[in-house]
Amino acid sequence: MFKGYIEGYYSRRLAIDAFKDLKAPISHYFYGPKEDIYLRHRWKEIDKNLKRRILPKKIKQVYCVSPTSDFFKDSKKNLSFLKKKLSHAVEKVGFDEIAIFFDDIDVTNFGQEAADKDLGKKHAEVLNEVSFHFSKQKNIWFCPSIYNLSLSKGIFDEGYLGGLKENLNKHIVIFWTGDNVISEKINNSSL
């Protein structure tokens, strides 16, 4: 099991000193704050001022990108942008690992292909291509559009997750939060 801190919310960044005060040791720090415009709204652009945080060496730093819902309008070109951006973060800036977050994006305007399984398949294809491109990476992390049981009801039902299950490379690490966005515990029935 991995223990980490995900900076992926809409608020102030965690101060460096806070890492010293954590009650439990962590192995990973995920840099993906929603307010960083280069991770979401301007995700096709490379942030020339991007820097790793100064953290204890034992903590792996993961660069997280959240492509917006327009990703699939020109997926071949956008996949090229994505690989370039992730390469910059790993090779030039020195991040240890990478992640793609497809959570919190509006997927209702995709049209017919958003019908359940197809969207899961499309997300899996993107992750598989990134995984192949970064085959030397220890971990490729993924937060799907549906990342807990409470979100799996309604329009997507189980189709989206089925599309992922059938197509996603088994080496990609998936974020799953159990029954709810914040779950006290995750047991087998939550998986």
Protein language model annotation of sequence segments:
Residues 53-55, 86-89, 164-168:
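Glycine-rich loops and low-complexity Gly/Arg-rich segments
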Residues 14-17, 48-52, 84-85, 156-162, ...:
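Alpha-helical scaffolding within the catalytic cores
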Residues 6-8, 27, 107-191:
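Catalytic-core regions of glycoside hydrolase
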Residues 1-82, 92-96, 103, 135-136:
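Feature activates predominantly on carbohydrate-active enzymes
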Residues 75, 81-110, 114-116, 122, ...:
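Hydrophobic or amphipathic alpha-helical targeting/insertion segments
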